[in-house]
């Protein structure tokens, strides 16, 4: 019961900061950037604590059957990259000059007063951990026990994509299709393997190098 309450508190805090404050009220400026970064770090740490059993299980699964988990890790990476290439090609065909609002906001963030190390920790490490906790461990892991995975996984992927969008326009939607496919691949992988560290590791690996390169280019 206590763990269920903690998960609900984590979800509520995530919704308040990243949906209501950022998407609905649309608070802007460096104040909200600091809020987002601190929320990612603090809620990411809280997510590690709340889902510590799931993370420990993932680590144990690597010890029990390392070859199986390596194959799933590689397969998940290849599937994610392949679907991302296809969806990016669709954007290239339909909107070749469009740059998503999220890409612009990330580049602007590294020109703000927020230190690069804070941005990298928030967006490259704790942000991915928090998002995996919400969309995979909480939604897919919990809801698929009561609702069909064929419903839960696509819905979770759709929500994951929607939370990264900054406008309800077709170009913005098309530019974020890779997020939907990533959510599908990560959701299926977690549901089948029960290993949370695969999607967490890939999510961090997907974000961290890009952020470091942006920080270097802006410096």
Question: Where are the language model's segments positioned?
Answer:
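Cytoplasmic juxtamembrane interface segments
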Residues: 47-67, 139, 197-198
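Juxtamembrane helix-loop-helix connectors linking adjacent transmembrane helices
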Residues: 57-127
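Alpha-helical transmembrane spans of integral membrane proteins, capturing the lipid-embedded, hydrophobic core
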Residues: 11-19, 37-41, 45, 69, ...
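Transmembrane helix-loop-helix hairpins at the membrane interface
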Residues: 116-219
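Structural signal for membrane-spanning alpha-helices in multi-pass inner-membrane proteins
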Residues: 18-22, 44-51, 80, 84, ...
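Membrane interface segments of multi-pass transport proteins and intramembrane proteases
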Residues: 27-30, 95-99, 143-151
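Alpha-helical transmembrane segments in multi-pass membrane proteins
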Residues: 5-56, 103-104
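Membrane-helix interfacial "entry" motifs
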Residues: 3, 28-32, 61-65, 69, ...
């Amino acid at each position: 019961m206590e763990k269920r309450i903690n998960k609900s508190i984590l979800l509520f805090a995530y919704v308040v900061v990243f949906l209501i404050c950022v998407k609905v009220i649309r608070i802007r400026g460096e104040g909200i950037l600091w809020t987002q970064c601190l929320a990612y770090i603090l809620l990411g740490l809280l997510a590690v604590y709340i889902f510590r059993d799931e993370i420990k299980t993932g680590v144990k699964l690597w010890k029990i059957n390392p070859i199986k988990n390596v194959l799933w890790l590689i397969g998940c990476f290849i599937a994610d990259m392949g679907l991302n290439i296809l969806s990016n090609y669709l954007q290239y065909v339909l909107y070749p000059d469009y740059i998503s609002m999220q890409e612009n906001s990330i580049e602007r963030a590294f020109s703000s007063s927020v230190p690069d190390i804070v941005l990298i920790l928030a967006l490259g490490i704790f942000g991915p951990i928090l998002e995996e906790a919400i969309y995979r461990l909480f939604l897919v892991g919990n809801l698929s026990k009561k609702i069909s995975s064929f419903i839960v996984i696509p819905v979770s992927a759709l929500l994951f994509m929607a939370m990264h969008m900054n406008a309800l326009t077709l170009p913005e939607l098309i530019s974020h299709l890779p997020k939907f496919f990533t959510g599908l691949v990560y959701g299926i992988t977690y549901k089948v393997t029960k290993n949370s560290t695969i999607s967490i590791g890939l999510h961090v690996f997907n974000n961290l190098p890009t952020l470091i390169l942006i920080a270097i280019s802006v410096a």
